[in-house]
Amino acid sequence: MKKSKAKYLTLAGVVLSAGLLLGACGNSTSSSKVYNYVYASDPSSLNYLLENRATTGDVATNLVDGLMENDQYGNYIPSLAEDWTVSKDGLTYTYKLRKDAKWYTADGEEYAPVTAQDFVTGLKYAADKKSEALYLVQDSVAGLDDYINGKTTDFSTVGVKAIDDQTVQYTLAKPEPYWNSKTTATILFPVNADFLNSQGDDFGKVDPANLLYNGPFILKSFTSKSVMEYKK
């Protein structure tokens, strides 16, 4: 995310036909100043780690990036990850993070680098708070089901590790050739521990100041049932 650009994205809370919606989506270009997108209802929360509603995910994925994302054709491409390897047995996925990935505040100020530990923090928080999206990964990540069900209280036994600041590793309970697709789910997105702790229960409330941003946009303002404005 670069603070120098002043591009805005406005979401108008009105109902249009599918044709108009697709037209609006197709007209967004790098040179456009305003992008209108139709949404059915206000997000009740932007806590991307706990919520599993489309109203949350559709907004949050414009603000926060994960390891992988979909391109315009639906292919999985790197986002915060710049490269990854898979072990021969298909159980261990190791991701190298981009060194230029940063967290920014709602004011556009640099807060901290995005690190591998942010992914560990995110999954632990999701497990501790019983995220609505746990079903997506509970049986996938080694040891996660035991942690969620209280068979262990030691999160270090769960198959997500920060090998170093730029390397995060997932160990799976069984091979999943489609694992990379799951990294686009917001439950596997990172979160900065210091910011999360400072926010407490306010983290992810629908207010620009209650999130950190590492994605394409910063939430500039929100008016219920009217406008959500993004700044790039």
Where are these regions (language model features)?
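N-terminal lobe/hinge region of extracytoplasmic solute-binding protein
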Residues: 38-88, 212
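Bacterial Sec-dependent N-terminal signal peptides
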Residues: 1-10
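Short, well-ordered beta-strand elements
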Residues: 32-41, 92-96, 119-122, 168-169, ...
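C-terminal motif of bacterial Sec signal peptides marking the signal peptidase cleavage site
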Residues: 22-24
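Bacterial N-terminal signal peptides
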Residues: 12-20
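Gly/Pro-rich hinge or "lid" segments in bacterial periplasmic/extracellular proteins
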Residues: 166, 172-232
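Bacterial signal peptide processing site
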Residues: 26-28
